């Protein structure tokens, strides 16, 4: 797959998923054009590696379908989701999914990108949607202050889950460069 010039993430490679580390799932909601995504993360804090596997990326999903897919793929594991739709999160939770909204603060996109850039990202070879995003996710401005809001659905899901594990629990124990 061809890589766009100036991609945000250069710290990734395709490799086998290893779920021997802390497991968490990230979710971004879409509907008609943008997909709803669920990404599994296995975080190796000691070696600063995050293993990534897209469980699904689908458009047009109903609340029941999202809940069913989440339960099938995530089981009892925590899913950290986009916080833009609290009613959807509540309905998914009521159907038995262990789901919480991400905490979006001012600057959370940039700090999440910086956090992910500090880790080696190992992408499961079957996660073609994520590979496509990583090859196309670029900065909107030369000053690298805002990414193009496209090619980011799996990436946003990853950011939500990684920030939950690595920032919210450690209260900012990483450095933004």
Predicted features along the sequence, with ranges:
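Mg2+-dependent endonuclease catalytic cores in nucleic-acid-processing enzymes, primarily RNase H-like
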Residues: 39, 46-149, 168-169, 174-177
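Gly/Thr-rich phosphate-binding beta-strand-loop-beta motif of the actin/hexokinase/Hsp70
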Residues: 18-43
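Active-site-proximal flexible loops/turns
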Residues: 35, 89, 163
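ATPase catalytic-site recognition across NTP-hydrolyzing enzymes
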Residues: 1-27
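Acidic, Mg2+-coordinating catalytic module of metal-dependent nucleases/exonucleases
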Residues: 148-169
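Residue-level detector of short, conserved catalytic/binding motifs and their immediate flanks
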Residues: 36, 77, 155
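Short, conserved, surface-exposed binding loops centered on an aromatic residue
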Residues: 15-18, 29-32, 68-73, 91
């Amino acid at each position: 797959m061809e890589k766009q010039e100036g991609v945000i993430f250069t710290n990734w490679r395709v490799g086998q998923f290893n779920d021997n580390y802390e497991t968490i799932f990230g979710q971004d909601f879409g509907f008609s054009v943008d997909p709803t995504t669920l990404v599994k993360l296995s975080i190796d804090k000691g070696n600063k590696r995050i293993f990534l596997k897209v469980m699904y990326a689908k458009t047009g999903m109903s609340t029941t379908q999202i809940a069913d897919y989440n339960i099938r793929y995530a089981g009892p594991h925590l899913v950290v989701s986009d916080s833009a739709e609290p009613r959807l999160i509540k309905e998914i939770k009521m159907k038995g999914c262990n789901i919480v909204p991400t905490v979006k603060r001012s600057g959370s996109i940039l700090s999440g990108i910086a956090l992910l850039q500090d880790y080696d990202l190992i992408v499961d070879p079957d996660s073609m949607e994520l590979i496509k995003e990583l090859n196309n996710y670029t900065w909107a401005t030369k000053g690298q202050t805002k990414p193009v809001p496209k090619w980011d659905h799996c990436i946003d899901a990853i950011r939500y889950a990684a920030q939950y594990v690595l920032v919210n629990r450690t209260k900012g124990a990483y450095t933004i460069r």
